[in-house]
């Protein structure tokens, strides 16, 4: 199953970008053994519209336009469902085992996500109830993707 990340906003050079890249690289190397492939990390510029609702609508349109037909869409939102790492790995494994070919994980902009995305989403997850900066969210999801691969492959990286 091909997995992509869609993020509103660009990750600037620095330790967050380096760490995210390290985990995406680990995922890209280990994922194919369990049927998961990193296809892309797409960054789009934040909308310059004058109000939040228009910005969210424009950013949602960019995301929806980039989705492949039939792609699973997982939104990251502080109001989403909290999963532990094993449950997240099992969710990815379940989509893979159902024969799903594409999965996109979306990180919204500073204003959040447009309501239309919740209607389209297959799942809405959170990385905890706290609000995280977008730079850290990207790093956290990169690490969790790598951790999911290690869980699915029985690698000892994930210890309970």
UniProtKB/Swiss-Prot annotation:
EC number(s) stated in the UniProt entry for this protein: 2.1.1.177
HAMAP family in the cross-refs: 23SrRNA_methyltr_H
Major localization listed first in the record, in broad terms: cytoplasm
One GO CC term, this protein: cytoplasm
Assembly: Homodimer.
Gene that specifies this protein: rlmH
Catalytic reaction equation(s): pseudouridine(1915) in 23S rRNA + S-adenosyl-L-methionine = N(3)-methylpseudouridine(1915) in 23S rRNA + S-adenosyl-L-homocysteine + H(+)
Superkingdom to which the source organism belongs: Bacteria
Gene3D superfamilies: 3.40.1280.10
Protein name in UniProt: Ribosomal RNA large subunit methyltransferase H
Keywords associated with the record: Cytoplasm, Methyltransferase, rRNA processing, S-adenosyl-L-methionine, Transferase
InterPro entries from the UniProt entry: Alpha/beta_knot_MTases, RlmH-like, tRNA_m1G_MTases_N
Pfam families (alphabetical): SPOUT_MTase
Compartments in which it is found: Cytoplasm
């Amino acid at each position: 199953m091909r997995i992509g990340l869609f993020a509103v906003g660009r990750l600037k050079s620095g330790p967050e970008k380096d760490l995210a890249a390290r985990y995406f690289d680990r995922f890209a190397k280990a994922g194919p053994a369990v049927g998961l492939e990193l296809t892309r990390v797409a960054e789009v510029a934040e909308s310059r519209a004058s109000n939040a609702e228009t910005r969210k609508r424009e950013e949602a349109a960019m995301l929806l336009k980039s989705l492949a037909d039939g792609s699973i869409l997982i939104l990251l939102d502080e109001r989403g469902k909290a999963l532990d790492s094993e449950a997240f790995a099992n969710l990815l494994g379940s989509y893979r085992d159902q024969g799903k070919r594409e999965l996109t994980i979306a990180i919204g902009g500073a204003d959040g996500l447009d309501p239309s995305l919740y209607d389209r989403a297959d799942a809405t997850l959170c990385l905890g109830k706290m609000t995280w900066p977008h730079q850290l969210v990207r790093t956290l999801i990169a690490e969790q993707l790598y951790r999911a691969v290690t869980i699915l492959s029985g690698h000892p990286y994930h210890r309970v």
